[in-house]
Swiss-Prot record:
Keyword Metal-binding recorded: yes
Species the sequence originates in: Rattus norvegicus (Rat)
Protein name, per record: Cytoplasmic aconitate hydratase
GO CC list: cytoplasm; cytosol; endoplasmic reticulum; Golgi apparatus; mitochondrion
Co-factor: note: Binds 1 [4Fe-4S] cluster per subunit.
Length: 889
């Protein structure tokens, strides 16, 4: 069908009549000029892709009518311009694509129809671990080990880049996906097939929102949704409310962008922005560099919004020039955005659009801070950290509590390391990592850390040798400017050598701690601390032996590493005493904003971006040497423990089955609030006594070769065994943290997988009970695929994180939500009942269903199928089944 809005297309430049754009001003609709800039991007995509099938004229009217429709939970389609993936989520996506080709062939279709129809960039950044640190060859040794362990996965990805059109792989060692996206992949405006249109994307990583800082609308989705977008399906989303976040004033000279983002995170958590867009405006925005904006946008999942948008302005255009983008392209970007009403001047309040609600922050009120000890939204001023940690020590087990008895608060343990004696206590820092795209993309905080290191070394300070220090930049550009500016040797002297280019400590790839340190922590039952410049510090994520983890700016990471403890008041106590007996305070070595900016102006230059990125796809010799098969259908190796054909499509036929009620289901797990996708499907180490470890041992592997759960996401047998295998999982059936549950028919306590297997062998369906914010954290598709493989038919929770809810639907698992004001406690549910959930044949979005217990009690819950499209996926047994049936016909 012809696009009903084709008449809006006109040339941007009369000298190039073949290159057109959809001029939304020709809609001659006064509502357009009042729309938030982020909603204008949704509108343009709908107008350009309107076909009266996937995108209808009524959708465009609904978006234009945003001021009214934002309150009505109206569903709109969005076709992003591209998709980005990292390797932990990218491997299972390519596995699914390979299995879908097999399934289409089996159903009599053409397997080569399964191909990305939009650009898909996969950046390998999640596999490298900090095994070696504090040595000049750390980088090479970690990269060699990464290749040795992941060769099979990398060969598979290389096969994928050759077998599928439109798929580009950025090799390992290049950097972190979101930083590479910001510095290199982002187009800001596409110039393709004779048409200009805004760059937009979804990514299989929740911190995809970082690109919103450059004015490119994007957010994280589950791997399952991303696969559908790659196959040409729009994302079906509820038209979001947009919170206007007004920034005013100027930050204090000692405040970093990290302090600003941690302040905003806490503030927006309190406002409540889940499922909404946040759009930044006000004169304060012009004070922020693109790196600062990207840092704020990066932590969007931590404050719970879907996107955190900074419209494009002159600062964005200057950044494109600074990062070596072609000047001619940059001119067209500005010209297009001005023509279509998407270019912003933050000092001109007449451009301010309508918002659902406006909240404000005066940047001069921001103080240096950290977040912790267990959640990114728990901001604590640096001046309060010592007091806060001590109150957490004694407080009841929880987000702000470790429940250490008062007479044990001063416990300590001595140990020998490298022939010297050291002492650890509660609050001792054992990991200090400058890591994560959140901060390493920001030259001001990275150079701030470098200058602080220089002053610390010159003042005679050092870091104790047992502290696991590391520096893992998000791109080669960082190393380039740290080296050129002369601060690199000082960072190395304090133990912050470059250990790899990847996510590393931020995602739990922190590697092992020295054995004597682990023994001291476990024997002393100590609350040891990790300090990192990352974006998440959920319990059990950073390292199993650091029960407290604080997010901090890179300079503060170094400061706490030198202090060796978080139980310090930097105002009153020195960081350390040098060889001359002089006390050195933090204020003596903290660099000012002016000092940092002077170095940044001199050393962060376009030439360095061009030099690093023009060879990014060819510079890794190990990658270039990999052999990969050339067939279009993948030849599965039955002996592989990394890549396995998944069972999702084995019994798939072309015919649809009517939905079935869930009868007499047992509760596999009875969980509380804030169960993260890390709890459901951990990404870190595979514990030696776990079901996944037994599976690998039975196949002849030793613990050294187990690798991490994240690296094994191409193997469903391991991932099913890793589901709910987080050691910090708190199950009400047990009243303790353990990856275990009670098998209700026998009363035995078993590993979660073993219990689920018993239920499945007996043909018994399962459900999970949970509290608020179920599935918060990473957009991890295995947190939905894993429960599906365990035989879980539904989850009953008080509320869900948006991405996880869609992922459950995408796998055919029913997300049920208690009615407002009701909870498991208010209904008197113990989880030991059996549940029958009546599923009617004709379903509607957000329909109420009847739940009956074997005790005779009945109550209602809402089925969280929010859109008609989600219902279609459910009827098909999931989104991928729907796509296969479509491609096979």
């Amino acid at each position: 069908m012809k696009n009903p809005f084709a008449h809006l297309a006109e040339p941007l430049d009369p000298a190039q009549p073949g290159k057109k754009f959809f001029n939304l001003n020709k809609l001659e609709d006064s509502r357009y000029g009042r729309l938030p800039f982020s909603i204008r991007v949704l509108l343009e995509a709908a107008v350009r892709n309107c076909d009266e099938f996937l995108v209808k004229k009524n959708d465009i009217e609904n978006i234009l009518n945003w001021s009214i429709m934002q309150h009505k939970s109206i569903e709109v389609p969005f076709k992003p311009a591209r998709v980005i993936l990292q390797d932990f989520t990218g491997v299972p996506a390519v596995v699914d694509f390979a299995a879908m080709r097999d399934a289409v062939k089996k159903l009599g279709g053409n397997p080569e129809k399964i191909n990305p129809v939009c650009p898909a960039d996969l950046v390998i950044d999640h596999s490298i671990q900090v095994h070696f640190n504090r040595r000049a060859d750390s980088l090479q040794k970690n990269q060699d080990l990464e290749f040795e362990r992941n060769r099979e996965r990398f060969e598979f990805l290389k096969w994928g880049s050759q077998a599928f059109c439109n798929m580009r792989i950025i090799p390992p060692g290049s950097g972190i996906i979101h930083q590479v996206n910001l510095e290199y992949l982002a187009r800001v405006v596409f110039d393709q097939d004779g048409c200009y249109y805004p760059d937009s994307l979804v990514g299989t990583d929740s911190h995809t929102t970082m690109i919103d800082g450059l004015g490119v609308l994007g957010w994280g989705v589950g791997g399952i949704e991303a696969e559908a977008v790659m196959l040409g399906q729009p994302i079906s989303m509820v038209l979001p409310q947009v919170i206007g976040y007004k920034l005013m004033g100027k930050p204090h000279p000692l405040v970093t962008s990290t302090d600003i983002v941690l302040t905003i995170t806490k503030h927006l958590r309190q406002v409540g922005v889940v499922g909404k867009f946040v759009e930044f405006f006000g004169p304060g925005v012009a004070q922020l560099s693109i790196a600062d904006r990207a840092t704020i946008a990066n932590m969007c999942p931590e404050y719970g919004a879907t996107a955190a948008f900074f419209p494009v302005d002159d600062v964005s255009i200057a950044y494109l020039v600074q990062t070596g983008r072609e000047e001619d392209k940059v001119k067209h970007i500005k010209r297009y955005l001005q023509a279509v009403g998407m270019f912003r001047d933050f000092s001109d309040s007449s451009q301010d659009p309508d918002f659902t609600q406006v909240v404000e922050l005066d940047l001069k009120t921001v103080v240096p801070c950290c977040s912790g000890p267990k959640r990114p939204q728990d901001k604590v001023a640096v001046s309060e950290i010592e007091k806060d940690f001590e109150s957490c020590l004694g407080a009841k087990q929880g987000f702000k509590g470790f429940q250490v008895a008062p007479d044990h608060h001063n416990d300590h343990k001595t140990f020998i390391y490298n022939d010297s004696e050291f002492t650890l206590a509660h609050g001792s820092v054992v990991i200090a990592a400058i890591t994560s795209c959140t901060n390493t993309s920001n030259p001001s905080v990275m150079l701030g850390a470098g200058l602080l290191a220089k002053k610390a070394v010159e003042a005679g300070l050092n870091v104790k040798p047992y502290v696991k220090t590391s520096l893992s930049p998000g791109s080669g550009v960082v190393t380039y400017y740290l080296r050129e500016s002369g601060v690199m040797p000082y960072l190395s002297q304090l133990g912050f050598d470059v250990v790899g280019y990847g996510c590393m400590t931020c995602i739990g790839n922190s590697g092992p701690l020295p054995e004597p340190v682990v023994e001291a922590i476990t024997q002393g039952d100590l609350v040891a601390v990790g300090v990192l410049s990352g974006n998440r510090n959920f319990e059990g994520r950073v390292h199993p032996n650091t029960r407290a983890n604080y997010l901090a700016s890179p300079p503060l990471v170094i400061a706490y590493a030198i202090a060796g403890t978080v139980r310090i008041d930097f105002e009153k106590e020195p960081l350390g005493v040098n060889a001359q007996g002089q006390q050195v305070f933090l204020k003596d070595i903290w660099p000012t904003r002016d000092e940092i900016q002077e170095v940044e102006r001199k050393y962060v230059i376009p030439g360095m971006f061009k030099e690093v990125y023009q060879k990014i796809e060819t510079v890794n010799k190990s990658w270039n040497a990999l052999a990969a098969p050339s067939e279009k259908l993948y030849a599965w190796n039955p002996k592989s423990t990394y890549i396995k054909s998944p069972p999702f499509f084995e019994s798939l036929t072309l015919d649809l089955q009517p939905p079935k009620s869930i009868v007499d289901a047992y509760v596999l797990l009875n969980l509380g609030d804030s169960v993260t996708t890390d709890h459901i499907s951990p990404a870190g180490n595979i514990a030696r006594n776990s079901p996944a470890a037994r599976y690998l041992t039975n196949r002849g592997l030793t613990p050294r070769d187990f690798n991490s759960y994240g690296s094994r996401r191409g193997n469903d047998a391991i991932m099913a065994r890793g589901t709910f295998a987080n050691i910090r999982l708190l199950n009400k059936f047990l009243n303790k943290q353990a990856p275990q549950t009670v098998h209700l028919p026998s009363g035995e306590t078993l590993d979660v997988f073993d219990a689920a297997e018993r239920y499945q062998q007996a043909g018994l369906p399962l459900i999970v009970l949970a509290g608020k914010e179920y599935g918060s954290g990473s957009s991890r598709d295995w947190a939905a695929k894993g429960p599906f493989l365990l035989g879980i038919k539904a989850v009953l929770a008080e509320s869900y994180e948006r991405t996880h809810c869609s992922n459950l639907v995408g796998m055919g698992v029913i997300p049920l939500e208690y009615l407002p004001g009701e909870t498991a406690d208010s209904l008197g549910l113990t989880g030991r009942e059996r549940y029958t959930i009546h599923i009617p044949e004709h379903l509607k979005p957000r329909m109420k269903v009847q739940i009956k217990l074997d005790t005779g009690k009945t109550f209602q819950a809402v089925m969280r199928f929010d859109t008609d499209v989600e219902l279609t996926y459910f009827h098909n047994g999931g989104i991928l089944n729907y796509m296969i049936r479509k491609m096979a016909q």
